[in-house]
Amino acid sequence: MLNKKTTLLLSTINQLTILYKKEGNKSYPLFYCYQLEKIVVFLRKQSTIAMKRIVLLLGCLLTVLCLQAETVYSPNGNVKVTFELTQKGEPTYTVWYKNKEVIKPSCMGLKLNMDDFTDELKLIESKTSTFDETWEPVWGEVKSIRNHYNELVVTLEHIDWYQLDIRFRVYNDGVGFRYEPRSGRNTAFPLTYYEVFEENTEFRLTGNHTAFWIPGAYDSNEFAYETTLLSDIHALTCNGSGIGTNKIVGDKTIQSPVMLKSDDGLYINIFEAALVDYPAMMLDVDTQNGYCLTSHLVPGATHAVAYMQEPSVTPWRTIIVSDKATDILASNMILNLNEPCAIENTDFITPQKYIGIWWEMHVPNHSSWDYASISGVRLKDMDWQAVKPHGRHGATTENTKRYIDFAAKHGFDAVLVEGWNVGWEEWAGRWKEEVFDFVTPYPDFDLDAVSQYAKEKGVKLIMHHETSGSVTNYERRMDEAIALMKKYGYEAVKTGYVGKIIPRGEHHDGQWMVQHYQRVVEKMAKNKIMLNAHEPVRPTGLHRTYPNLLACEAARGNEFNAWSNGNPPEHETILPFTRLMGGPMDYTPGIFQQKMDYYQAGNPCQVHTTLAKQLALYVTMYSPLQMAADLPENYERFMDAFQFIKDVAVDWDDTQVLEAEPGDYITIARKAKNSDTWFVGAITDENSRTATIDLSFLDKGNYTATIYKDGKNAHWEKNPQSYQIETKKVKNTTVLKIKLAAGGGCAIKLEKK
């Protein structure tokens, strides 16, 4: 005979079974597992044979229930994500796109100092929800963005009662997921403070995809991209020449984002979003056991990769997928996974075009950042008035006024001045802490006079804060530096992090530096200052939350063409699929004098594009902060082509990706903010091709197309300055066929009549 308590328990089991059969497609199975487990624990204490049989049956039922998969679809049904635990309690996920498997069952989890969320987990609860909103960015590629996803949150519990929520958001173009550890039922030793040792996120791919990648490195993302099969990735063979801190992690470690193309025509981008208070994610490549990418977090100076405080979350791990390459470039998923704007009054944020004292430091036989040929500089002991200048200093009062005049004449918003402040004599390669004070100008730069002159001309000045990697020094002096900017009316600053990081042992992409970049952008926002960060961690969509972060470099920019083996012609056709997925890049386009032997006989360096392609980059390489990077005197030689740079917008109401193939070509059309005028950019790699530009995106009516294109004999290496300009009438039924030279492009202004 069964006692009353046992009879009651069996009745409960029966009711749970009935409910499961009725509601099994919902989240209840997780609740059943939890309740049945408690029942099993009680029954195990009983000693009768009947009880043992019941325990065996319940154990089987518990196993079946707990292996139930949780599935969530995108709003349009194209993307499917399934979460389940293995029999060992290991969390796994799988991703499909249009019934094609994109990510095979892949492990998930975190290893902490206080717990291991990688196995022996049980499902406690599962919740699903739908979210749909439309929001307007302060600036951007489109006027409004729809944020529409279905969410699944699974709650897992370890044997020591700590809990882990894994939150999935599934969009029509992909999925993002993140980890949210918490104390759960463990009140004795809560996760108030904890350390992350490792993240166990896998991306198990379905085949030997083509990959567009750069080698894993904790302190630089300024490598040229490689295009290989996953099985042919060998990071240690990559050339890091010209990169100040270019130590490669290992032969099978690459950086995210990575762009992939499968044999069956799927385009897959793997990255992260909302990187805050956490190290950046590299990817370890394993092709010995299938084709698997595994998270590799950038370490810090100590034993842990991250130090966290509850409540906390990791960045989103993102997978964007489509059968069209154009959809990858059109995706807003990274932005949508970031928090809404945190700045109450954004009136001070204005997209803009600028010129600057910068390129003349890169080309041969021109200017320098430093003022004198001296060594052993100690800032506090220097009498700069007594120092003999070497005569090559670029940031002089007169030279700055020349740039201000050019900006005022041609309608540019601002002038960047690099090398204005003392300390450049020993700024690189010494791991020195006291390099700059960010407030003291060189003797030949009259800050008062220059600021007043710019004000009279209606031109803003952009401040420059190069840190040389000495971040502790910058943080100590930042308030004083900002006060100087406010005094002289500076509204924007370009920061730089060339060199090894101080605190010593930290990395550019580690948690400590990610926290620093966040402190800087927040402090600048508080002081109503716009920010352009060079050599930071690559962006992950944080400009939604802090739109004063106008742009970052965080990749191999145009400057490398002046003094290294340069950027291959395919470079600009890969960057939008990789680095620019996380945010705008200050690529510094607009170089009209491509060959460096113009400045120095026999110099082999050159920009690996035609002049027309440099114009097209203002459209294909999105940024609300665009530089006309060449010397003013070079623009004066090509004023008809320069007109496009003067005309092109930097803020947009609409963007249409017309053609795209990573590593080969891109054609993009953008509609200027509050205007009927469109601009088109088309670029190609080292192969010439014909761009097919369907103008059906135009409204009804007649337009005048001003077309800047490669000349008949143009070639990025042999004849880069050959271009043609033509004007023709078009409408929305017009399809343009434009020949792009090798390494070439075209730029078009479409003005409604």
Question: What label would you give each PLM region?
Answer:
Residues 1, 7-20, 27-71:
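Bacterial Sec-dependent N-terminal signal peptides
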Residues 71-344:
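N-terminal accessory beta-strand-rich subdomains and adjacent acidic, glycine-rich linkers
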